[in-house]
Amino acid sequence: MKVGTVGLLAALGMTLTSVSVWSLTPEASQDPQGPVVGSDLVVADPGPAQPVIRADFTAGSTVMVEGRLGNGVMQAGRDNETYLMARVFADGSARASEAAPVNLAIVIDRSGSMKGKRMENAINAAKGTIAALNRGDVVSVIAYDAEAETLVQATTIDEISRQRVTEALSNIRAIGDTCISCAMDAAERALANRDGMVNRVMLLTDGEPTRGMKDVSGFERMSSRLRDKGISVSTIGVDVDYNERILSAIARESNGRHYFVENADSLTKIFEEERNALKQTVAKDTELVVDLAPGIRVEKVFDRAFRQEGNKLIVPMGTVSGGEEKTLLVRLSVPRGAEGERAVAKIDLAYQDLVERRRGSCNGELAALISSDPAKLTPMDPFVAARVGRSETAQSLLDANALFAQGRVEEAQKRLTAQLEELNRRRAEAQKTPNFEPKADKDFDKQEAALGAANSGFAQPPPPPGAAPAKPAPETRKGKAQTRSNAEAAADLAF
């Protein structure tokens, strides 16, 4: 800390409270490669080894963490509510000399509904992924109907084994029912005991589970178990008759992605996207810890699995690929207090660095200014406002899906319209802030597009004169497709 800063604080007669002491505790896990940068609202820093606290910060190297408070200045003399946002990202500049080894399970639905072109396209997409794997990667192939069959046990890729795995894919035939939970159990076993690798399941289905586990909560528990073992599951729903709630839940709880493929011809693109992300993975076992200052309370954690231990929120974030970002949003209650700087939270990010081949970490701290001067109060940070909008938009899409499934089409559209109005209000407020940037505007644009597509997709034109009565909206192909598109959009917005 600068001598001038010490003198100024002494001249003002300020003393350190217990909260201030908390905020200045040294952080042993600070990554020496990762400088901390941010805007003003700086509290005294007694030494160069300690993080500076402020209303926003960015820290890290291979993987970065950006922390932001929704409101940098809050009203004195009353309880306040604000948001904390953490963005975990790799900008693509850090690259390993060679890709991290992959431990992949390809899981394909072979129930009767997959016959024909769907199965052909699924097999071809999987073959493309096998062809792109590096020597030393490990792959398993599982096909499932009423039960799961491991067609290829965990196999290390070389030129001979690559051909054998490809031939095994050609032998998949569509028959029987659908047991997704059986397939996930088999994938979990196939991926076991492979330390130092990036573990991924690519699960494809076109239908409802008709055998085994059938409830969303059961799949959430199963997916959490896989996540805790370092396994993420990316789910691919084909056509319009699969259960989007189950596939979304699997992906969300395991830190994977969810895809909707209306036309099976697009499967190759999805498989390519997944394998490119795997090849560009720079970190695994990534975990955020948000250590709240005394008195700060959690009101809600949005969109992500977490556990709370005292004042600490522990949030697993899975793998991070170059160019990828993942976010955490938390609504906080800040109790009334005296004017001055108020510590809010420390944020620590820890991960297995696949570029430097070591454990990596970085951190920073967030603090707000408590003021009785109304002129100093700040509107919500535009990036936080956009992220709040994403959670609200994702929820509105899911709410609209539920209403639509009940045949309450007008109510579904009203829910979407109401969220669009709220989104426009948030955007207008954000645009007035001095640090508004095009990136935040693009975030709002993406949400607006998702809401517009949903409203349009749910619209049901009246049948022409003399035509037979139309099917109920939820039973039409258009309605089913829009419901699944909404679920995919919601999963992406919440990521």
What are these regions (language model features)?
Residues 19-30, 334-495:
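Long, acidic serine/threonine- and proline-rich intrinsically disordered regions
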Residues 8-20:
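Hydrophobic membrane-insertion alpha-helices, especially the h-region
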Residues 321-339:
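Low-complexity, intrinsically disordered segments enriched in Ser/Thr together with acidic residues
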Residues 149-153, 293-301, 354-358:
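Short aromatic-acidic-glycine turn motif
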Residues 2-3, 22-29, 50-52, 66-72, ...:
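Exposed acidic/Ser/Thr-rich ligand/metal-binding surfaces
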Residues 301-325:
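Extracellular adhesion/glycan-binding regions together with long Ser/Thr-
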